[in-house]
């Protein structure tokens, strides 16, 4: 062919705005085009002459060093095949040709370079596609996709089962550097692995933890965060992933809700539907026997060298939505992924993906790590009394609780700023034949019922303490008889973190009462002075854990239970306008009163929003008892649209107090 007649590509327009809108990727803050696999995108190609029937246009899509590339030529067929990459002419006008390209629904995800007849057409990112029915992350409901893929804000649910608190969280999966960071975390995967949401999600989960190959977050539960950021300070995944991307170093520090928030962000960023999930009264079984063993002395104090298991007030992980083509049928849908460094799986700290369907049925052999998650949501709690007998210890089982683990499993409701209870997705109703059958299937043995003959039953009514006020407990004792009986009650109260880590014992309350009738209430009280001066001993939010033992004097029968009390603190008041303009100052006015009898130290108020470039803060060293402070924080919105502003208050003694408001930012 005469070189003067050779077909030459002069330019390629990736039609970023048009394609991004069609692929639901217009919010990504990147100069590169972001596409979803299995869906048509358009290219506008300028040639040196009109395209003729004998001409060839060859497109090469390359995913990087040592990675395969796809070569696609013009297809004369007008219809698209069911599989593979394809390219067709959509429109031709003189030297301008519009091409429609469709990637394979199981294509490698990641960063691509593209060449058209050796012309460098640029770079784009290819994501998983929940809108594509042939993609293994397909999600049928548009409302679900809007929530689990596109929503960049949400809530974490914290506290404990009887006193659930919501914590606003900014996922920010579209923000600058986030997508780059997520794909850089996956550079160690083989091409075939980058096709699978199962393997990609497991790899992302692994790389969230700094203990695994310099991953994103350093876990810290010591209460000393002096060389980093305290976990409770974070309210967004964005600064964490941005810092990791820029520095290539692990970010200090995280706890379970931070790990969950960042993992949810990363999964949504690469196109895998995801949600942060909270399990209240979450078991941590160190012996893999599907139960938690707690050992008490005769006053109700825990015995640390024997009590290796723990029950967390709450624990958070992330659910990801996908087909499980690597498993038998019936395990598609939500999968548990947990990047909090608790357990080793195949040599690294990670959990999952574990099918929620398998967890519910007790199918603990199903991959990955289903035994651990099953115990978290459906384990049993054994309480042992350790008795000293002639210098020897004797362990006596005094309580078996089959319904106290895995309460109020929660996530944000689709399309609403409310909590959704999804407990029955993870387990059958407590006490039902199906629930006990799942436990039997998981453990391989029938449940222990040797304590069912007990005549005395114990429970506790309270679930909170107003900070600065006495601890008041009401113990409820139930019997089948109305005969008067003397009962010894011993209640040990600890100050501990949400993971069950005991920081100090506040004291033991002991009382002997005569109970009459089939139900009796016994009041116990401890003055606030026993705890108020210990709140700042560690830089963590603290709760009160109580272990109560009741003994019938005549028969010696003992029963036990435990309770968790959270501290309540009155919120501060915040004023901000309902509307504001981009690039103009917005003023937030705060009013706060210290209602405690002790000074509050290391005061910090902060404002975060996806409408701001940076977090804004106001700090003060000390607020004396009874003192009221008023101040203003000024910030400048840089993005239009409805933007949620989160104002947080923290101090050494009081944590996790916040207010929020949506402000409409206009041009």
UniProtKB/Swiss-Prot annotation:
Its EC number is 2.3.2.13. Residues 430-449 are annotated as: Disordered. Its cofactor is Ca(2+). GO terms for cellular component: collagen-containing extracellular matrix; cytoplasm; extracellular region; Golgi apparatus; plasma membrane; side of membrane. The keyword Metal-binding applies. The active site is at 256, 315, 338. Induction: Androgen dependent, as shown by the decrease in the level of the protein following castration. It is found in: Secreted; Cell membrane. Keywords: Acyltransferase, Calcium, Cell membrane, Copulatory plug, Glycoprotein, GPI-anchor, Lipoprotein, Membrane, Metal-binding, Secreted, Transferase. Binds 1 Ca(2+) ion per subunit. Expressed in the coagulating gland, the dorsal part of the prostate and in semen (at protein level). Expressed at low levels in the lateral prostate and seminal vesicle. Not expressed in the epididymis, kidney, liver, serum, sperm plug, testes and ventral prostate. It comes from the Eukaryota. Ca(2+) binds at residues 378, 380, 430, 435. GO terms for biological process: mating plug formation. Glycans are attached at residues 151, 220, 227, 408, 472, 488. This is Protein-glutamine gamma-glutamyltransferase 4.
